[in-house]
């Protein structure tokens, strides 16, 4: 699944396998490679979806509740990966209800009573 997302970009099978293996390991999914989607948990499916989105190294990442289906521990790991990507000059825009993750943002907007307002940003 992740491999095909990479293969669609440059048609280099060896590179696609290498990149897919690397990102799958980073999301802790190495032991799930031979499983069908119906055999995976919601959190595992969410991590695969994120892996597919990230494998081609987009400059801009737009994510709506990227950790919504994940337990707190796995969610923290996903945000660590996203934070590392940010340091590689990638723009990451995400919506979240999780205050901890919202506070990790450099710039934050909040919706209060149906109105979008700027909020305190991290320095």
What do the predicted segments below correspond to?
Residues 3, 14-31:
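Conserved ABC ATPase "signature" region
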Residues 35, 55-56, 88:
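Conserved signature/switch motifs of ABC ATPase nucleotide-binding domains
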Residues 36-40, 44-46:
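Conserved ABC ATPase signature
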Residues 61-64:
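Catalytic Walker B motif of ABC-type/P-loop ATPase nucleotide-binding domains
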Residues 72-74:
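Helix N-cap at the start of a conserved alpha-helix in ABC-type nucleotide-binding domains
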Residues 76-87:
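Helical segment within the ABC ATPase nucleotide-binding domain
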Residues 90-95:
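Conserved H-loop
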């Amino acid at each position: 699944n992740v491999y095909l997302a990479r293969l669609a970009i440059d048609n280099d099978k060896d590179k696609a396998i290498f990149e897919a293996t690397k990102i799958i390991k980073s999301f802790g999914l190495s032991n799930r490679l031979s499983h069908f989607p119906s055999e995976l948990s919601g959190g595992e499916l969410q991590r695969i979806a994120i892996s597919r989105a990230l494998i081609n190294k987009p400059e801009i990442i737009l994510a709506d509740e990227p950790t919504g289906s994940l337990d707190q521990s796995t969610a923290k790991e996903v945000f660590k990966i996203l934070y590392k990507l940010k340091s590689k000059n990638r723009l990451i825009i995400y919506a979240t209800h999780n205050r901890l993750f919202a506070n990790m943002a450099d710039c934050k907007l909040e919706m209060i009573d149906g109105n979008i307002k700027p909020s305190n940003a991290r320095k």
